[in-house]
Design a protein with these regions (language model features):
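Conserved AdoMet/S-adenosylmethionine-binding subsite of the radical SAM
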Residues: 55-56, 78-197, 204-206
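Radical SAM enzyme [4Fe-4S]-AdoMet core and its adjacent flexible, acidic
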Residues: 141-151, 158, 162-274, 278, ...
Length: 363
């Protein structure tokens, strides 16, 4: 018997089929160091048994007729194409008339004709990580040998366009490219990207015993990684691009943050958890079946359990996860809750970790 999610919104769990394994070593990547949590496990790849178990349970837990699978990394394309073909076979096996959609995030460097044929044929949406023009992108996005990745990413994007694959850009805003908002924005228009997600990089330093350096909420430290964008930079970056976009590009180019802000303004669901009053509806499952509260909270204290010992419903509608979601608002300082702009930004104290005065509010 299927156990259904008790609320109307879909159960959403991001999959990490290779964990933190990646062919790049981007300086600011928050996920690379997660491999230290699994240093005793020799192979960081999702096996067929776990893949089938997750797909069956994930589909059977849904109340909606449309079901979205999201594949994330690490670098997702380090799993062979056969793995994703197998995933689609299993999705159809357990779909029982429901519509299945897939989206996949990639750094773009491993895309080939064969990959793009598959993505187009099966209508997969692709997210490509690219940080603007070459001089910005290559500053932090390099491979393990220190070589730049921009040229390979652009070759991948060319292939996506060649085969007509739908794709959007996930662009990290850091201490370097934040000072050039129009150059950054115009680059995406020049390469034909109409859907853009801007993500500010804000990482605090906390030295863990196992070698991890990034802090989570509750690990009180004001020290930031050097690549972190400042509040002033982030504010100027958004305002400058917004002025350009609202005067020239509305309806032609779509910027996720602006769409979400408008949704908040008119009382609609913003569609992204970072812009919601509460969160906790989007978890993540690692390559071995471990489940965490959020993709940005893969820390031991935010582990909900393992799919082999607990159901997805038990984990995501249990007290621990519900409290996690409510704390996004509860932990805000009074100054943020009383701010006239709160409705617009729904500041994400959970993500930045600045619980005394949120980082966003300073910009």
């Amino acid at each position: 018997m299927a156990i259904f999610a008790p609320f109307a919104h879909p159960l959403y769990v991001m999959l990490k089929p290779v964990g933190a394994v990646c062919n790049l070593a981007c300086s600011y990547c928050y996920y690379l160091e997660k491999s230290k949590l699994y240093k005793d496990e020799p192979k960081h790849v999702m096996n067929d048994k776990l893949l089938e178990k997750f797909i069956e349970e994930y589909i059977n837990s849904q109340t909606m007729p449309q079901i979205l699978f999201t594949w994330h990394g690490g670098e997702t394309l380090m799993r062979p194409l056969a793995f994703y073909k197998r995933a689609m076979e299993l999705q159809q096996k357990y779909a029982h008339g429901r519509t299945i959609s897939n989206c996949i995030q990639t750094n773009g460097t491993l895309l080939t004709d064969e990959w793009c044929e598959f993505l187009k044929k099966n209508d997969w949406l692709v997210g490509v990580s690219i940080d603007g023009p070459q001089e910005f992108h290559d500053r932090y996005r390099r491979n393990k040998q220190g070589q730049p990745s921009f040229v390979k990413v652009m070759k991948g994007i060319h292939l996506l366009n060649k085969y007509g694959v739908d794709w959007n850009a996930m662009a990290v805003v850091n201490n370097l490219n934040a000072d050039y908002p129009l150059e950054f924005y115009n680059f995406f228009k020049e390469i034909g990207c109409r859907y853009i997600q801007f993500t500010p990089i804000v990482e605090r330093i906390f030295r863990h015993n196992d070698g991890r350096l990034l802090a989570t909420i509750g690990e009180d430290t004001p020290e930031l990684m050097e690549f972190s964008v400042t509040p002033e930079q982030w504010g100027n970056f958004l305002c400058t691009i917004f002025e350009e976009w609202v005067h020239n590009d509305v309806g032609e180019y779509y910027i996720q943050l602006f769409d979400a802000t408008l949704a908040n303004w008119v009382g609609e669901n913003p569609g992204i958890c970072t812009m919601g009053k509460t969160c906790g509806h989007a978890g993540v499952m690692e390559f071995n079946g471990d489940v965490y509260s959020c993709d940005h909270f893969v820390f031991p204290q935010y582990k909900l359990g393992n799919i082999y010992s607990k159901t997805l419903i038990e984990m995501f509608y249990g007290e621990k996860q519900l409290e996690f979601g409510q704390n996004k608002y509860r932990s805000l300082p009074r100054q943020c809750k009383n701010c006239k702009s709160y409705l617009l930004v729904m500041v994400n104290v959970q993500r930045t970790g600045f619980v005394k005065l949120n980082w966003v509010s300073l910009g």
